[in-house]
UniProtKB/Swiss-Prot annotation:
SUPFAM superfamilies: C-type lectin-like. This is Snaclec coagulation factor IX/factor X-binding protein subunit B. Heterodimer with subunit A of IX/X-bp or IX-bp; disulfide-linked. GO terms for molecular function: calcium ion binding; toxin activity. InterPro entries: C-type_lectin-like (IPR001304), C-type_lectin-like/link_sf (IPR016186), C-type_lectin/snaclec_domain (IPR050111), C-type_lectin_CS (IPR018378), CTDL_fold (IPR016187). Residues 24-146 form the C-type lectin domain. It comes from Protobothrops flavoviridis. It is found in: Secreted. Calcium is required for ligand binding. Ca(2+) binds at residues 64, 66, 70, 143. Belongs to the snaclec family. Residues 1-23 form the signal peptide. When linked to subunit A of IX/X-bp, anticoagulant protein which binds to the gamma-carboxyglutamic acid-domain regions of factors IX (F9) and factor X (10) in the presence of calcium with a 1 to 1 stoichiometry.
Length: 146
């Protein structure tokens, strides 16, 4: 009987140590598919939010979505945490890398862009993306790989 209890306990310890990746995330972060996520309520502009995320954990950044399932998880997390709001994600046009072309197919050689850059946010009510000036304030979600 003692041997059975000992072996059962051993299997339980092994099972618990191998199950789930939630243990890889800090206790106040949420885990999904090997990544850790946390919404933050203090509004920041896009650059300050990205900088803040890099300081939270090694490899941290504003959230980036690799699938609709991941986006659904993060949108639900943001809504459950703060209700209706908008949240920055890591997508932006800060470096103005768009390949613009004139309607007559001529290459864009002369540029006179305003200093405004645009960054992407999502609403916590759906996972539809929108852009706005990066200088605007919004809540945000940080992410790092567990």
């Amino acid at each position: 009987m003692g041997r059975f209890i000992f072996m059962s306990f051993g299997f339980l310890v092994v099972f618990l140590s191998l199950s789930g990746t939630a243990a890889d995330c800090p206790s106040d972060w949420s885990s999904y598919e090997g990544h850790c996520y946390k919404p933050f309520s203090e509004p920041k502009n896009w650059a300050d939010a990205e900088n803040f995320c890099t300081q939270q954990h090694a490899g941290g950044h504003l959230v980036s979505f690799q699938s609709s399932e991941e986006a659904d998880f993060v949108v639900k997390l943001a809504f459950q945490t703060f209700g209706h709001s908008i949240f920055w994600m890591g997508l932006s046009n800060v470096w103005n890398q768009c390949n613009w072309q004139w309607s007559n197919a001529a290459m864009l050689r002369y540029k006179a862009w305003a200093e405004e850059s645009y960054c992407v946010y999502f609403k916590s009510t759906n996972n539809k993306w929108r852009s706005r000036a990066c200088r605007m304030m919004a809540q945000f979600v940080c992410e790092f790989q567990a």
